Amino acid sequence: MDPALAAQMSEAVAEKMLQYRRDTAGWKICREGNGVSVSWRPSMEFPGNLYRGEGIVYGTLEEVWDCVKPAVGGLRVKWDENVTGFEIIQSITDTLCVSRTSTPSAAMKLISPRDFVDLVLVKRYEDGTISSNATHVEHPLCPPKPGFVRGFNHPCGCFCEPLPGEPTKTNLVTFFHTDLSGYLPQNVVDSFFPRSMTRFYANLQKAVKQFHE
């Protein structure tokens, strides 16, 4: 992928993520519990929903980021039940790459294994926040693979945010914005994301404790 185009695209995605983060209008809460809130609103990108999760994770910002960051050989594959593989297709800079993520079957196998090819940008902000910003791309080195339905992530990612005066806690805001593709009943998709996002936070908390205590 052309580096200049990749840089331009990724900065546009990061800007869109900031808009999602700042925009408080139109969100409807669909799941709450254990300190985690999941809400949604209709996507402007595809005929589906944009989901937003927010919760406090007990761990320093760097510890939490270490568990969620997109990295080959990283911890995410070890604890996230919705990720079975992560590979770099093209490394563009230290903070920008094209990746392939594979996911297992889900929802009692109604959702078959998926894979996603994304342009991913990591950004650090002046207040200490670290964000991962991703969107789907096509890449000649990663055509569709047998055994996987190719899904498409629209602008998505997460913000690991410091909590002033509480260095051992991190506010994690996540955005899931995924077209799972294939022929899936909408009610299956609508019930899958809020449940899986709630589990994501619970499993992440266990991972921070397991890998960083």
Swiss-Prot record:
Keywords: Lipid transport, Lipid-binding, Transport. Pfam families: START (PF01852). It comes from the Eukaryota. One of its GO terms (biological process) is cholesterol import. The keyword Repeat does not apply. One of its GO terms (molecular function) is cholesterol binding. The keyword Transmembrane does not apply. InterPro entries: StARD5/6 (IPR043556), START-like_dom_sf (IPR023393), START_lipid-bd_dom (IPR002913). CDD domains: START_STARD5-like. PROSITE patterns: START. SUPFAM superfamilies: Bet v1-like (SSF55961). Residues 1-213 form the START domain. May be involved in the intracellular transport of sterols or other lipids. May bind cholesterol or other sterols. This is StAR-related lipid transfer protein 5. It comes from Pongo abelii (Sumatran orangutan).
